[in-house]
Amino acid sequence: MTIFEELKARGLIFQTTDEEALVKAFEEGPVSFYTGYDPTADSLHLGHLVAILTSRRLQLAGHKPYALVGGATGLIGDPSFNDAERSLQTKETVEGWVEKIQGQLSRFLDFENGDNKAVMVNNYDWFGSVSFIDFLRDVGKYFTVNYMMSKESVKKRIETGISYTEFAYQIMQGYDFYELNAKYGVTLQIGGSDQWGNMTAGTELLRRKADKSGHVITVPLITDSTGKKFGKSEGNAVWLDATKTTPYEMYQFWLNVMDDDAVRFLKIFTFLSLEEIEEIGKEFDQARHQRLAQKVLAREVVTLVHGKEAYEQAVHITEQLFAGNLKALSARDLKVALNGVPTYEISADENLNIVELLVNAKISPSKRQAREDVQNGAIYINGERVQDLDYTLSDTDKIDNEITVIRRGKKKNFVLTY
């Protein structure tokens, strides 16, 4: 199976320019290709992972990746399928984000070894020194307004309004392709399907200005089986930065993927062979309640993004929380697992009665309700039920002298810190 056939079999090719010419280019020898990442935040997220892993697959097949971080285009803002104008960031902010994103990309692509080792580039290197007049004369003249207006990303914004800044973005992305081709012989661009218009601006510029052919592959924007945009949890992006989305949170995200999506995501997000995935799929279909596909998915992706140790910690936390054995976890583990849970700080020597504590920490709305909660067995301290109205917290309830977890009912957790 060729690399192009494998990408197709994994569902990683949404659209291409001339497919026959592209297949021929892969067959004739190593292809130099690039993927662009605009610094719109201080971290990449799961949505970026599809293109990143596609780049890694091509590198493993012998092709040479260029990872372009948009130090210049990040200052402008891509209008593609955004309902409103993006807020412009300061140069200092974008530079900081560029540095962080470069560090994240180095986890997935090999920048050290072989003739096809990855190369990191920043488009500020060429845009930073070009004058506005030169850009209009040397690049702008190759794009008609009619051509630019025909792009879906622009059409959608015409009625609500689009600034010239964002309107010109597609020319900048097109020029990236031209520069990378001239400097490094790059002939292929890979990106999300929402980037098709911007990406083909690059092939158009190559054709008109240099009389050369360029290729484009778009990877699909991943949605779940309900059509919901993938890569967000409770409305928030699942980040690749462990300080923004912990390995435990990422593990839980994959563990809770819907059954109908799990095997498909194994093809997209893991490096397991298609044969292995087929076998996992068969076993999974025999007993979906055991969630084999989700467990393998969580193992593979968390290990890939954060390492084996982080994966094992996420599993340990999950198992102990499920068993209600909170005292088997460290305060650090619990803080990771309960990130975002309401927290109440009390003095280490404050000996509050359980009823007073529940009211003061706003766990129960009133003393009457607090007493009922305790008597009805709805209150748990570190996983153990408390039904004694005279119960007072002691040092044994303080995990690592740092934290106590109180649960009200089945799911409402609260954290006490000292």
Curated annotation (Swiss-Prot):
Reactions this protein catalyses: tRNA(Tyr) + L-tyrosine + ATP = L-tyrosyl-tRNA(Tyr) + AMP + diphosphate + H(+)
Full protein name: Tyrosine--tRNA ligase
'HIGH' region (motif): residue ranges: 39-48
Pfam family, one: tRNA-synt_1b
Transmembrane region(s): none
EC number: 6.1.1.1
Cited function: Catalyzes the attachment of tyrosine to tRNA(Tyr) in a two-step reaction: tyrosine is first activated by ATP to form Tyr-AMP and then transferred to the acceptor end of tRNA(Tyr).
Subunit architecture: Homodimer.
Protein family (similarity comment): Belongs to the class-I aminoacyl-tRNA synthetase family. TyrS type 1 subfamily.
Tagged with keyword Transcription: no
Lineage: Bacteria, Bacillati, Bacillota, Bacilli, Lactobacillales
Keyword line: Aminoacyl-tRNA synthetase, ATP-binding, Cytoplasm, Ligase, Nucleotide-binding, Protein biosynthesis, RNA-binding
Species per Swiss-Prot/TrEMBL record: Streptococcus thermophilus (strain ATCC BAA-491 / LMD-9)
